[in-house]
């Protein structure tokens, strides 16, 4: 029987323990994986004070997007918090980080704006770019429904290793070269939108900065590197 995990303390980038395929946090003596879509939904909808209880060590993936969490939030509603939200990071100047041929840059700006760029050899994806000045309304309508995506060869490898049992097509878009195995897409540029969904969830660990964040070939590792840099008081004003 799995224990229930209660999360009452403020989350922070220093709790990240793994960011290879998803974002995994260390919470006391336990770890919680695949937190990014839930955190994106909470932060994207404007929630600042939330008490979470989780059974097991993984947040449910649902359909691979944040849509289910957004719908659940809308069902219960949002009420004003009794205490003020934490201050948002204010950059002193540009912050640029690299991982291999991937790069993320945060530049001071009045409004939190995201620019995502991806470039894949698979023709079904190719090069995509999308920009959004983030508001709760735009998050709900234009970002939350975007699903995670993967590639047919990855699914076959995972099945051969006995790691998944036929559920991949229910919680991810699967690309096979020049086509999608399980269409239709919710947006023509759904992959790059999902990359920004992941970025929002990872930056929720520190709070949305007053900045424009541009990311090329983003990953959870790169995103959480930026979150850690934003949490460094020598780089930003809090």
Over which residues does each language-model region extend?
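C-terminal regulatory domains involved in ligand/effector binding and gene-expression control
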Residues: 1-4, 8-49, 53-238
């Amino acid at each position: 029987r799995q224990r229930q995990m209660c999360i009452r303390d403020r989350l922070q980038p220093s709790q990240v323990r793994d960011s290879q395929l998803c974002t995994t946090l260390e919470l006391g003596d336990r770890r919680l994986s695949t937190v990014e879509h839930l955190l994106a939904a909470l932060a994207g909808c404007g929630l600042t004070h939330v008490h979470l209880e989780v059974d097991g060590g993984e947040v449910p993936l649902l359909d691979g997007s944040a849509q289910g969490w957004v719908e659940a939030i809308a069902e219960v509603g949002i009420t004003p918090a009794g205490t003020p939200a934490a201050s948002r990071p204010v950059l002193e100047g540009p912050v640029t980080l690299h991982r291999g041929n991937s790069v993320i840059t945060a530049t001071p700006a009045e409004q939190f704006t995201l620019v995502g760029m991806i470039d894949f050899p698979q023709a079904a994806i190719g090069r995509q770019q999308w920009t959004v000045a983030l508001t709760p309304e735009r998050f709900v309508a234009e970002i939350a429904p975007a699903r995670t995506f993967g590639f047919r060869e990855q699914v076959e490898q995972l099945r051969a290793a006995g790691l998944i049992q036929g559920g991949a097509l229910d919680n991810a878009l699967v690309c096979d070269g020049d086509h999608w195995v399980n269409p239709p897409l919710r947006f023509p540029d759904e992959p790059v939108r999902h990359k920004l969904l992941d970025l929002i969830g990872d930056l929720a660990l520190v709070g949305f900065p007053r900045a424009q964040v541009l990311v090329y070939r983003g990953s959870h590792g790169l995103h959480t590197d930026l979150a850690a840099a934003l949490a460094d008081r020598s780089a930003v004003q809090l």
